[in-house]
Each structure stands twice: as structure tokens, then as C-alpha cells.
Amino acid sequence: MLLARDGAVAAFVRDRNAFLFGNVVPDVLVGYMVPDIADPIPYRITHFAESEPIPKPRAWEFWDGYVTPLLHRAGCGARVEALTIARERERINRVHYPHRYEGMPDLPPIPSAESSTRPDEVEQSLLDLTLGTWAHLLADNIWNTRVNEYLTARGGKPSEEFRIKKQGDFDWFGKTLHVESVVRATPRLKAAASAFAQYPISSDEVLKATGVIHEVVRENPGRADHPPYRLLTEAFFSETLAEVLDTTDRLVSEVLDKTNC
């Protein structure tokens, strides 16, 4: 959604494929997203958060420790666009059903930059991946802060019943969002993931995570309606989502003018 709104994040990111992968990085090695992680990394490490009922990731610490050292690459390099699920389907269909496309022009070739493993381009992708990870942590901080405030305002406190209702509401809200971009496990992305400074992510883990992303996007084209929320409200979701997007763009805009390329 940040890339689609043409704000500061969209202007800053060069490798959109890496940025989108970064958006899920905190949930990969903790074991939430990818099954059968041999040695899961504790949540307090992957999410920069204390072990509490409604944890609030310290996104600013992650920025200082991992994004700032890479900012010398900001704005450098050729753009790598994200792949939509529709384009992926068309590429696959052209392989399996070539007769359907007889007489039609070929799809544009994939730019060589998308699979490049040149050190400077991998470093650019690493910045975008790391920025995506920060965006995840910032979003979690804002969402959980607002959930905590919502609960406190109604005299409630965290409990197992609260957790179940909250998770159910978030699951349904997620299904209402129209998401069409998927991540490609390119050599460039794998190289950037293995160089992720907080903890390396192996090629196998990248492949597994991108597979999950593809399934999620395929199964959730964006629903027009949903069952009634059990804890939160439509207003809560719309207002907090807007805050997440606006805050992320605002913070990134503060470094846009300092790019070196």
C-alpha cells in the first residue's frame, strides 16, 4: 500500500521486490510465517520488543542500528519493480498454454538488474529490504499502541479471550485489503537477504517465505465485506491504517533530501 500511494516511500525505494520481502522479514525466522524453522529466533529479537501482552516494537532502535548505516546507498541504482499476481499468472499461462497467445506480442523481457548480484546493486537491495523490515516494526508499534489505548479506554485488560477476538478481527480486516504484488526469489534478493545485518536469511528460507506470500496474495484478492468485528471497529481500522501509512511516509520523507545519488 505504501508503494501504491506514491509518497515518500515510493520515491525512496529502488528495489520494490526487496522492500516487499522486507515487510515480512520479522515474521519469517520467528516461525510465524514459515513452518519448520529449525532454530526460531525469539520474538523479542526479531521484533525489537519486550515480552508483554501487547508488545510495541522499538522501530527507532532498528532504524538507528540497521537502516542508518545503509543510507549512503539511498536513491542509487536502477529501479526494480514489483511483480503483480496477474502478470505472474500470465507468464505461467504462456508456458503451459502457448496456443492461447499465438499472434500476441511477447511480454517485455525481465530487466537484467532484477537478477544482478553486483555488490553495489545488492547493497541497494539490502537497504530496501532493511527499510521494509523497519516499516513492519513501525506498523506493529502503531497498531499495538492503538489497540492498547482502545482496550484501556473501555476498561479492559489483555486476556486470552481478548487475544482471540483481536486476532480474528485483524485476520478479517487483512482479507478486505486488495493486495496484488508478490515477491520473486531472485538471486539479487537472496544475496541481499543473506547479508541482512540483524541475522542472515538463507536462500531456502527466502524460497519458503516467497511461497507463502504467493499463497496469501492468491487467496486474498480483497473482500468487499466481512463478518462483524468482535472487538474492534471499522473506524479503528481505517483510522489506524491511515496513521500507519502517513507516519511511515513522513519519517522517510525526512531522509529523502539527504540522498547521495
Spans of features found by a protein language model:
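N-terminal leader/auxiliary helical segments
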Residues: 1-261
